[in-house]
Regions:
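Acidic, Ser/Thr/Pro-enriched low-complexity segments and adjacent helix/loop capping patches
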Residues: 1-118
Length: 118
């Protein structure tokens, strides 16, 4: 089943990242939602809020997955890539794991296809 996304999309130039993400994270925190950060179609991270604290941030770069528990660490990772990012909010009850798993599955399929072609 497709996941129903009600997005908050914020585009930021470098230098605007901190205030924009701060705003997005506050919206997510008060609404009891999770935030998925997408950079040019790749899922960069998912932040799940419980009791007004960031429970986890899963940052996906290529095939590596990193746990980050600090918003500033996440911002520095994002700023290493493209300056334009989008922030999507999900209801916490939505199946966020499915989003992440499907992203990994798609990457794995593409990698496998490339290996076979070589």
């Amino acid at each position: 089943a497709p996941i129903n996304v009600q997005p908050i999309v914020l585009f930021a130039e470098e230098g605007e990242l901190n205030p924009l993400f701060g705003k997005a994270l506050n919206v997510a925190r008060t609404a009891g939602t999770a935030v998925m950060i997408v950079d040019t179609g790749r899922i960069m991270g998912v932040i799940v809020f419980k009791d007004s604290k960031a429970e986890k941030v899963r940052v996906i770069r290529g095939f590596r997955e990193e746990e980050v528990d600090d918003v500033n660490a996440l911002l520095s990772i994002l700023s290493e890539g493209r300056a334009k990012v989008a922030v999507y909010t999900f209801d916490v009850n939505e199946i966020i794991e499915e989003v992440i798993d499907s992203a990994f599955a798609a990457k794995a399929v593409r990698r496998d296809k490339k290996v076979r072609e070589e």
